Amino acid sequence: AWDAVHGLSESFQYYLLKASNEIAKEKGHCENFGRTKYADGILPIDTYKKDVDEICSEELQHDWESLRASILEHGLRHSTLSAQMPSESSSVVCNATNGIEPPRDYLSVKKSKKGPLKQIVPSYGTLKNNYTLLWEQPNNTGYINIVAVMQKFFDQAISGNWSYNPINYEGSEVPTSVMANDFLTTYKYGWKTSYYQNTHDQKTDEVEPAHPMGWHDNVEDVGIQGKTRLDNLLEELDNSNEEECESCAI
């Protein structure tokens, strides 16, 4: 998984920079470009925390040196280009998951000014066995590594999160040592900032919050009475035509 994230993140940043450089050739670089590290030919691949290579040691696949030379000559039309933010409001519109955050469940029910909205994870019928739900994760290792590998290439800080399910620990209590280790590990692997520390409250609510860390943008949680409706809905999707749109079906 880390290798795939590494390749995608590298291409993401490389082509963002390449496109901005091409625009700069045509229209000139952005105002105050000289105040950026890019103006000195410094790229994210030069400044990332080298401990990340313990997670993934994949070689770079793009010609960064030619791009560096072109940036030094022509500049960039943008001072920054990449960020990884939660996308809750837009995810409702396009039926997507919330950025890189694991979904809390396959089905969420949210309400907006226009009324309750049912949202199923994308391609549930074909990808249901490939989703890792937030509270099914045994620990934060996988998530920490993914954010670290992405941060290697991004030129803005990613705010990551830690999530804990008490049932995974003796006495249903998350040890302080576990949380401290996660904190130190994120620092070691180059996290710039952290955001929320989530703890599963074991409620039987079958929906994920409007934002996995509790922030609401005109979208609030709506409870579902019992589990039967969810089971019936997912069973219906299992038996539906794969070509049908899950969002439209519900």
Predicted regions mapped to residue ranges:
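Catalytic alpha/beta core of large soluble enzyme barrels
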Residues: 25, 29, 46, 53-61, ...
